[in-house]
Amino acid sequence: MRKKPMLAYPVSDKPINYEDKIFIQPKLDGVRCVIQYEKGFNPNLDPSHDDRSRVVAYSRTGKEWKNIEHILFLLKPWFALNPNVILDGELYNHDLRDDFEKIISLVRKQKPTAEDRLDAEKLTQFHCYDIIDETKTFEERSRFIQQNVPRNHCIIHVPTTQGICSEDQAKAIHKMNLRLGYEGSIVRTNDKYACKRSHNLRKFKDFHDAEA
């Protein structure tokens, strides 16, 4: 079953309680991507073959991404050992942050050519920032990513800053994210994952968003 990812509200929608555990990540200007293991779903394999499972990637609306085979290939052995984990992140490349359309055009191809696949392999990365698990707090989910999800040239862990104690501290980190070329910042509370738009996840792109 394909899960819907958690979506963010603007920071201005509801005040943040900095007495709780608060986390900040850079906001990526990428393509939302959920990756999970699906058992017995590959009709292209010989029925006598033992392994009819596959790793599948899809958008926030459930549309399958067809042109990231290089990422799915690297993740399949890991998913075979972790079949119930669902990764949440974005297809992104920080070196292409000023050419967002390039990533979009590559990942949206439903019938990619050999050249399209080569371009995607060179340019498209999966940046993982959460796992879809409605039983764990964000701190637990973040720790799982750091300790278990593989990292390489095309699978990246999104950095997480924890222990945010005040709005001034949050703004300072947000300013640093902007200076590093990110679209903005994502603020997370230490709550369980919600497969809907949730105040557990807030976004702001500039200081006006935070102060509105």
What are these regions (language model features)?
Residues 1, 150-162:
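Short, basic, glycine/proline-bearing loop/turn elements
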Residues 1-14:
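Phosphate/adenylate-binding "loop-and-lid" substructures adjacent to NTP/NAD/dNTP-binding pockets
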Residues 5, 87-91, 184:
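Glycine-centered structural positions embedded in regular secondary structure
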Residues 5, 26, 199-202:
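Flexible, active-site-adjacent loop/turn segments at secondary-structure boundaries
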Residues 14-153:
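Covalent nucleotidyltransferase
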Residues 160-211:
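Amphipathic alpha-helical
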